[in-house]
Amino acid sequence: QASGLGMPNLAPSIAGMPASYLATQIEHFKKGERQSATMKPMADMLDEAGVKATSEWFASLPLPLPEDPAWRGDKDPASLTGGEKLAYLGDWRRDLPSCVTCHGPEGVGVGEHIPHLAGQHADYIEDQLKAWQAGTRVNDVNGIMGAMAKKLTAEEITAVAQYFANVQTK
């Protein structure tokens, strides 16, 4: 979509993501390092200048994020359940850090390489976690997401995806 907000079951929200992150993802689609029957032909149409222009344009769009994201210390651990509990506390018995350790408070994203999860479509988050589990997505830095995803149950994937999809954004 022209807004960059995507559509559930079709395309992720990419508005406001860092241009360098978007350019890297486009290059990964072009090289076959990320799998998508939809994105591969679109990426293949772009030359270097097209990748740069496309990435910069989507990066320039407003990214709807929580106005005042809750930091880990702002939440009472005893009150957290389901996907929010996993997102904020992880499960150290399984060497599974919290999602917000890397993705920031309420999944707002961090820097050039760690995308936002807040307000992202639940189906997209689920699909990506399942792809990392299955080894069909392998373009994460140092294999971190693949290793984390493999520790999640199907129920946990759904719960954490629903949590981030429902984070209230502006």
Name each model feature, range by range.
Residues 1-4, 54, 96-106, 160:
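The canonical Cys-X-X-Cys-His
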Residues 42, 141-144, 158-159:
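Residue-level hotspots at or immediately adjacent to binding/recognition sites across diverse folds
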Residues 19-76, 84-85:
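Extracytoplasmic c-type cytochrome modules immediately beyond a signal peptide or single-pass transmembrane anchor
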Residues 4-31, 40-46, 100, 104-134, ...:
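Gly/Gly-Pro-rich "capping" loops immediately C-terminal to redox-active cysteine motifs
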Residues 5-10, 63-92, 110:
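Electrostatic cytochrome c docking/interface patches
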Residues 36, 65, 93, 136-139:
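Alpha-solenoid repeat scaffolds
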Residues 2, 31-32, 61-64, 89-90, ...:
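Generic structural signal for alpha-helix termini and adjacent loop/cap motifs
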Residues 44-67, 82, 123, 150-170:
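C-terminal capping alpha-helices of c-type cytochrome domains
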